[in-house]
């Protein structure tokens, strides 16, 4: 599938050339280049597990939703690959104006640094969803529908979840009442669409609810909500310390749940231009100390550049200490 005429470094350079430009400036890759990114990345996704087992240190990012200049701000702040290892939790496309640049840069980095750069599937990496919420229209306007279908083939092979040093369980959405053993995730065959119910659906769609005990209906009309007791039981059963997920806008870019046993990350500040939220990235160091780097919502007249602040939390104990979370 590799195309000798496509220059990966040139693609990355052009995607990064707009750093410092006024947000909104587009990067128009050729159709052949995008097809190469989709096909080559798809090969790599299939060659790696659907349930990734990763090692710290790494940086974890939540939803991006087509906000390309905010993605560049995240890399400015955390270090452009290969300066740091990254794990993204899905929802790269839809809603924002530059889904194509976002997904092309992420796929290019995946191809360039396959063992250091990881992206999971979100509920928007699914044809029935991104057909409606913007990505299809962006592909059709800037290229053609055939290219959108090429992206769909790639998205259908994305990994679903990742475990960091056996202690941090990450996915886009949340837990599932059907999840008893990690083997169940490993047995999911790719390529696959996202079904309307069941384990894969829940991992991409479910949400925590602090006021709930057990499982409840989800206002989204898909999957479930789950209470703090579900999180505690899950972590105890699997000898883990933390669930890290995305999928919901949170005001500060990150938000704890269930006595810091779960954290929600959202990395698109000023989401859709309608929210005043910050975006956050979580850094996990070798001892599994988690810290947060915050992209503050930009003021209306502010041009490109990150406003950042860092906050550290002893969220998980060192690897060999299994006495529970530090405060």
UniProtKB/Swiss-Prot annotation:
How does the cofactor attach, per the note?
Answer: Binds 2 manganese ions per subunit.
Per the record, the major location class is nucleus
Q: Where is the composition biased (Basic residues)?
A: 317-327
Residue numbers binding Mn(2+) 2: 91, 123, 172, 247
Query: Which key words tag this protein in UniProt?
Result: Cell cycle, Cell division, Hydrolase, Manganese, Metal-binding, Mitosis, Nucleus, Phosphoprotein, Protein phosphatase
| Region described as Disordered: spans on this chain | 305-327
What are the EC numbers? 3.1.3.16
- Reactions this protein catalyses: O-phospho-L-seryl-[protein] + H2O = L-seryl-[protein] + phosphate; O-phospho-L-threonyl-[protein] + H2O = L-threonyl-[protein] + phosphate
Which residues catalyse the reaction?
Answer: 124 (proton donor)
| Effect of deleting the gene | Simultaneous knockout of dam1 results in inviability.
Specify which residues bind Mn(2+) 1 according to the UniProt entry for this protein: 63, 65, 91
Q: Name one GO biological process term.
A: positive regulation of attachment of mitotic spindle microtubules to kinetochore
Name its cellular compartments.
Answer: Nucleus
Phosphothreonine: residues carrying this PTM? 316
**What Gene Ontology terms describe what this protein does at the molecular function level?**
metal ion binding; protein serine/threonine phosphatase activity; RNA polymerase II CTD heptapeptide repeat T4 phosphatase activity
The enzyme's first-digit EC class, named in words, is: hydrolase
Q: Which domain of life is it from?
A: Eukaryota
Cofactor requirements of the protein:
Mn(2+)
Got a GO cellular component term for this one?
cell cortex of growing cell tip
Subunit comment: Oligomer.
Functional note? Essential role in cell cycle control. PP1 is perhaps required for exit from mitosis.
In which family does this protein belong, per the annotation? Belongs to the PPP phosphatase family. PP-1 subfamily.
Question: PANTHER family of this UniProt entry?
Answer: SERINE/THREONINE PROTEIN PHOSPHATASE, SERINE_THREONINE-PROTEIN PHOSPHATASE
Q: What is this protein called?
A: Serine/threonine-protein phosphatase PP1-1
Q: Which organism is it from?
A: Schizosaccharomyces pombe (strain 972 / ATCC 24843) (Fission yeast)
Name the gene: dis2
